[in-house]
Amino acid sequence: MMAAGAAVALALWLLLPAVGVGEAGPPPIQDGEFTFLLPAGRKQCFYQSAPANASLETEYQVIGGAGLDVDFTLESPQGVLLVSESRKADGVHTVEPTEAGDYRLCFDNSFSTISEKLVFFELIFDSFQDEEEVEGWAEAVEPEEMLDVKMEDIKESIETMRTRLERSIQMLTLLRAFEARDRNLQEDNLERVNFWSAANVAVLLLVAVLQVCTLKRFFHDKRPVPT
């Protein structure tokens, strides 16, 4: 079962660096998700750059491995410990506002000496749109009094739709993670049921053979027959 989990763990890191166009500046922030295999007795950390005055939401879930638990820590770019959890199956944490720099996320499986863990986590950024960009876009259109529908209403509707679509994508991603965890758990239970069922059948057959042999010994008379 964990071999299948290892195949899932080969998912590509989706937080790809963006290339700026025009004037040099920091790349735009991007949401991302990642699934990886955490070996027994190991600790693995990830670093994610974040701009200042934004919102960072971190969601993680253990979807494979005995116990379905892991230790989790989140540190700020200044090295301040923001979140520390022990032996948790999942968690959701929000940092707001963020500091400019690299945040450190660590998953620790040191307490387990045998079982590896399949871990999924997602990073969700949210920041206010650049006011200059919004004003420049608004100046490029005709005055509001010349339109049947106010531009402010259109912008509000588009922003609401964008937010809902992004949240829908995030919820679907989490549902996929829940489905993967439940499937792995069911496969583990199926293996246990099959193993113990086969063991019970073997014991029943052994008992039946012993009973037959015992009954044969009762009816087998080795005394000589007088002639």
From Swiss-Prot:
One Pfam family, short name: EMP24_GP25L
GO cellular component, one term: endoplasmic reticulum membrane
One of the protein's GO biological processes: protein transport
Expression across tissues: Widely expressed.
Main location: membrane
Signal peptide from the UniProt entry: 1-24
Keywords of the record: Cell membrane, Coiled coil, Endoplasmic reticulum, Golgi apparatus, Membrane, Protein transport, Signal, Transmembrane, Transmembrane helix, Transport
Top-level taxonomic group: Eukaryota
Topological type in the membrane: Single-pass type I membrane protein
Every GOLD domain range: 43-125
Subunit structure of this chain's protein: Homodimer in endoplasmic reticulum, endoplasmic reticulum-Golgi intermediate compartment and cis-Golgi network. Interacts with IL1RL1. Interacts with RNF26; this interaction is important to modulate innate immune signaling through the cGAS-STING pathway.
Function: Potential role in vesicular protein trafficking, mainly in the early secretory pathway. May act as a cargo receptor at the lumenal side for incorporation of secretory cargo molecules into transport vesicles and may be involved in vesicle coat formation at the cytoplasmic side. Plays a positive role in IL-33-mediated IL-8 and IL-6 production by interacting with interleukin-33 receptor IL1RL1. Plays also a role in the modulation of innate immune signaling through the cGAS-STING pathway by interacting with RNF26.
Name this polypeptide is given: Transmembrane emp24 domain-containing protein 1
Organism: Mus musculus (Mouse)
Gene: Tmed1
